[in-house]
UniProtKB/Swiss-Prot annotation:
Designated name of the protein: Leukocyte immunoglobulin-like receptor subfamily B member 3-like
GO cellular component: plasma membrane
Listed InterPro entries: Ig-like_dom_sf, Ig-like_fold, Ig-like_Receptors_ImmuneReg, Ig_sub, Ig_sub2, Immunoglobulin_dom
Motif (ITIM motif 3): 742-747
Gene3D superfamilies: Immunoglobulins
Origin species: Rattus norvegicus
Residues bearing attached sugar chains per UniProt: 79, 149, 336, 477, 493
Gene name per UniProt: Lilrb3l
Extracellular side: 25-560
Signal peptide from the UniProt entry: 1-24
Length: 761
């Protein structure tokens, strides 16, 4: 009976599947795609056409055209057919499938759009508000395309896919476009990861590359996570630190979020469920400063946010801060102490921290005009042993409360209690020579672990572990060495230490007045400062003197500056040399032109066969001394003619010639020096020889004397000065130069007025 019922049931189910075929109505197939309907270019995709059993062949269409046909195997009937493509392109793609039985064909499936991404550059996506929302809240996301005239689409990852499309709005002034998507409500039972794409309107299946993902953190109701920083929340710039988040045992992923940021700071996905995640920052910078919270997500949903971790970065400002204890860093129990924090920088606030970071206090800075410093006074008391410890002071500005200055020097506060006081003695006496080493011994019959040595009025306290003696005493020795004393005995060793609270790469130690090159050492960071130690062993008198220490940054920067200065100096030197050479060249050409002009004038004067005239103009002499000079000149020329037997052949200019120069050739004779010429010729004789001279003009003459006797001498009477020179002799008609040069004296007349014959000299 049971077997019969089972057989009838199977027969009924089989007939049910074949009823549509027999009646002529084939069911419409369903088309799906794997891995997703949105894939990047070059991705392998597989289309799955779900159909009925007994299909003879299946067909896949792309954009209405038959793409592929698959013949079915009747021996292994299935209700699915797969079509695989190894490399999809960026063409517009819309797919459908259908199937055919022995007698009929089915209808087409519903269209399936395959979207290909990566055709354009990616847009940018950001959250306009805090990406951390409560369950049921809304968030505004801003998408900016990288291409103009593109439509924007916002998608969310996950099993329930949603998308939003918008045309961007453009600012005509900035020419930037964007679209705002208001998404929600957001629930705490899933992750919300958004991406943005852009596409052209005529190709809606071809998208750009996806934007960077933006994940919204939903504050849930699961157990709150915890957060802590190692080595601490106050850390110096450039050092490494680790932030730990701890939550539920089933947590799959942890999120670290910085308050005020529009994106998730960091994400840590666990390989296996656990309750702790590690976020490492290799080198802390000022951008890491701020407030942080942790979240975790599991299959049950989101956790509550952790408490706030405030990360402070120190060493951002290099202006030093000084900390001191008033009246003394050693305070009796129950007493008060004032910690004085000062700086020359105009910080808005000072903050005092304890080494274990269990104590922090901040005060507004106060300006002191008398010292030109800013200060803050931290009053502590009544003092208890809990207040003892090491303190530091920092300065910062109000607009950046998580960015602090370099720290002050450590200040240790001691609380003197009711225990028995120790004893202090010196075996070397109380009077010492300068530079000697001093050993102070501190001891007590109480079993103390440490002793501290303090100088009255000072700020430095030296600590040392105690030793136990057989007599039951605890004791220790404090040795005050030569360092930092500047008095050293010959043969001893000394160490000079250069240090700075500012960043220094290399320290340079130089001795004043020494010709030796300075010493250089790379700096080392110790006790929150940069320092280098220059050791000298077996010092002698040659090493005595005054030393100075300098700090420098990377030498390559100074090398570049030195090269730049050298190049500029050489360029300036080349330009200066060029200007000097050019000026010298111009002066040489100017001198050559002047010499050529003078030679041309000399050739014209010596080679003229006819009188050569020059327009000197009429010059009148009203000075009696000038008239006397004229008489001497006339007398000198006449004396040359009468005493030395020199014959003058004169050429007078034509009557119409406006120029009054006359050239006279002197027959071969010896020309006497000017001192041998006797001015005894009367004005009447000169006036008789030059009857055509006009009144009111002066006559100047210049005699030229050659060291060697000359055969031919020219004399020109000039109206100004007596010139002397040697002219190049004119060429003969045959082109040959005369055998000897000629010496001439230009005696040019300026047509003086007639001298009365009856005038006495």
């Amino acid at each position: 009976m049971t077997f019969t019922f089972t057989a009838l049931l199977c027969l009924g189910l089989t007939l049910r599947l074949w009823i549509p075929v027999l009646t002529g109505s084939l069911p419409k197939p369903i088309l799906r795609v794997q891995p997703d309907s949105v894939v990047s270019m070059g991705t392998k995709v597989t289309f799955v056409c779900e159909e009925t059993i007994g299909v003879k062949e299946s067909h896949l269409y792309r954009n209405g055209n038959l793409q592929r046909t698959v013949l079915k195997n009747h021996q292994k009937p299935t209700n699915k057919t797969e079509f695989s493509f190894s490399n999809v392109d960026q063409q517009m793609q819309q797919y459908q499938c259908s199937y055919r039985t022995q007698t009929k064909s089915s209808d087409y499936s519903e269209p399936l759009e395959l979207v290909v991404t990566g055709a354009y550059s990616k847009p940018s996506l950001s959250a306009q508000t805090n990406p951390v929302v409560t369950s049921g809240g809304y968030v505004t996301l801003k998408c900016e395309p990288s291409q103009d005239n593109h439509t924007l689409i916002l998608t969310v990852e996950g099993s329930q896919k949603h998308s939003w499309r918008k045309d961007p709005e453009c600012n005509r002034y900035t020419e930037k476009c964007h679209a705002l998507f208001y998404v929600g409500p957001l629930t705490s039972n899933q992750r919300w990861i958004f991406r943005c794409y852009s596409y052209e309107k005529h190709t809606p299946q071809v998208w750009s590359a996806p934007s960077e993902p933006v994940e919204l953190l939903v504050s849930g109701k699961l157990q709150k996570t915890t957060i802590k920083a190692e080595p601490g929340s106050v850390i110096r710039s450039g050092r490494a630190m680790t932030i730990w988040c701890q939550g539920d045992l089933d947590a799959e992923i942890y999120f670290l979020h910085k308050e005020g940021s529009h994106n998730t700071q960091s994400t840590q996905t666990l390989q296996q469920p656990g309750n702790k995640a590690k976020f490492l920052i290799p080198s802390v910078t000022q951008r890491h400063a701020g407030q942080y919270r942790c979240y975790c997500y599991s299959s049950a949903g989101w956790s509550e946010p952790s408490d706030t971790l405030e990360l402070v970065v120190t060493g951002i400002y290099y202006y030093g801060v000084k900390l001191s204890g008033l009246p003394s860093p050693v305070v009796p129990e129950g007493g008060n102490v004032t910690l004085h924090c000062t700086s020359h920088s105009n910080y808005d606030k000072f903050i005092l921290t304890k080494e274990d970071q269990k104590f922090t206090s901040s005060l507004d800075a106060e300006y002191i005009p008398s010292t030109g410093q800013h200060q803050a006074l931290f009053v502590m008391g009544p003092m208890t042993p809990n207040y003892s410890g090491t303190f530091r002071c920092y300065g910062y500005y109000k607009h950046t409360p998580q960015l602090w200055s370099v720290p002050s020097e450590l200040l240790k506060i001691f609380i003197s209690g009711p225990s028995r006081k120790p004893s202090l003695l010196s075996h070397q006496g109380h009077i010492l020579e300068p530079g000697m080493s001093l050993t102070l011994q501190c001891y007590s019959d109480t079993k103390y672990d440490k002793f501290a040595l303090y100088k009255e009025g000072g700020t430095d306290i030296i600590e040392s572990f105690s030793q136990w003696t057989k007599a039951g005493l605890s004791m220790t020795n404090f040795t005050l060495s030569v360092m930092p004393n500047s008095t050293v005995h010959s043969g001893e060793n000394v160490t000079l230490m250069c240090w700075s609270t500012y960043s220094v790469d290399t320290f340079i130690l130089s001795k004043e007045g020494s010709g030796q090159p300075p010493l250089r050492l790379k700096s080392k960071i110790q006790d929150q400062q940069y320092q280098s130690e220059f050791s000298m062993s077996g010092v002698t008198s040659k090493l005595s003197g005054t030393y100075r220490c300098y700090g420098s940054h990377d030498s390559s920067l100074y090398l570049k500056a030195l090269i730049g200065v050298s190049v500029a100096f050489l360029l300036f030197l080349f330009i200066l040399i060029f200007i000097l050479l050019r000026r010298r060249h111009q002066e040489k050409f100017r001198k050559d032109d002047e010499d050529a002009q003078k030679g041309k004038e000399l050739q014209l004067s010596t080679g003229a066969a006819e009188p050569v005239t020059r327009d000197r103009g009429h010059q009148k002499r009203s000075n009696p001394a000038a008239a006397t000079q004229e008489e001497s000149l006339y007398a000198s020329v006449e004396d040359m003619e009468t005493k030395d037997g020199v014959e003058l052949d004169t050429w007078k200019p034509p009557e119409g010639d406006p120029q009054g120069e006359t050239y006279a050739q002197v027959e071969p004779s010896r020309l006497r020096r000017a001192g041998a010429i006797s001015p005894v010729v009367s004005r009447e004789q000169l006036n008789t020889k030059y009857e055509q001279a006009e009144e009111g003009q002066e006559v100047d003459s210049q005699a030229t004397e050659s060291e060697e006797p000359q055969d031919v001498t020219y004399a020109q009477l000039c109206s100004r000065t007596l010139r002397q020179g040697t002219a190049a002799p004119p060429l003969s008609q045959a082109g040959e130069a005369p055998e000897e040069p000629s010496v001439y004296a230009a005696l040019a007349t300026a047509r003086p007025g007639a001298v009365p014959k009856n005038k006495k000299q």
